[in-house]
Amino acid sequence: MTTGGHGTDGVERRGLMFVLSSPSGAGKTTLSRLLIERMPGLRMSVSATTRPMRPGEVDGRDYLFVDKPRFEAMVRDDELLEWATVFDNRYGTPRAPVEAALSAGQDVLFDIDWQGTQQLREKARADVVSVFILPPSAGDLEKRLHSRAQDSDEVIRKRMSRASHEMSHWAEYDYIVINHDVDEAFAEVQSILKAERLKRERRIGLVGFVRGLQGQLQG
């Protein structure tokens, strides 16, 4: 039996997996943060990773930091919904907490690349809503990468080279947002999430709700 939580109108619904992907520097991390801050009922998926912890990060909040043998065991035991290798580090989404959230009617936000999105679709297509964020220009993307001041020139060159390959998968996504301005891009992404929450097939309580209305009218 499918379970779910209640939307703002009181109708029970199943949660969804809301995916944001983009080349590094196109704005998906900022947009993800704004969504978590401003959209009730949305929680961030916490990925497992083999990369080293960065200053200010907290294990279990930002990522689940694991070593390579543990990550390989998670892949082998089908504990991950998706996983990918990025710049020699592995990232993956633990299955159990996501499935529990969806069943409770909570939406889960994913900040993952095209490989992870493809794997999510293969395992749970009906639950996935995907958005690809594009920069307004290549020059703007490079400027943003330099302004972050967290990567060397060599790493930035690699990210720019990888960006073209990542963008080649744009047509695999449900929605495309061009991030000219972060406030405008956020408004567009927020509108997508609000509309997807109202999809008939996710609102599993509608059958009972409509029958109740019909009963009132016929009584």
From Swiss-Prot:
GO CC, alphabetical: cytosol
Alphabetical list of SUPFAM superfamilies matching this protein: P-loop containing nucleoside triphosphate hydrolases (SSF52540)
Gene3D superfamilies: Guanylate Kinase phosphate binding domain, P-loop containing nucleotide triphosphate hydrolases
Key words, A-Z: ATP-binding, Cytoplasm, Kinase, Nucleotide-binding, Transferase
Highest taxon above the source species: Bacteria
Catalysed reactions listed for this entry: GMP + ATP = GDP + ADP
Residues annotated as binding ATP: 22-29
Keyword Kinase belongs to the record: yes
One Pfam entry name: Guanylate_kin
Presence of the UniProt keyword ATP-binding in the record: yes
MF (Gene Ontology): ATP binding; guanylate kinase activity
InterPro entries: GK/Ca_channel_bsu, Guanylate_kin-like_dom, Guanylate_kinase, Guanylate_kinase_CS, P-loop_NTPase
Protein's cellular compartments: Cytoplasm
Function of the protein: Essential for recycling GMP and indirectly, cGMP.
Similarity comment: Belongs to the guanylate kinase family.
Protein name per the record: Guanylate kinase
Organism field: Bradyrhizobium diazoefficiens (strain JCM 10833 / BCRC 13528 / IAM 13628 / NBRC 14792 / USDA 110)
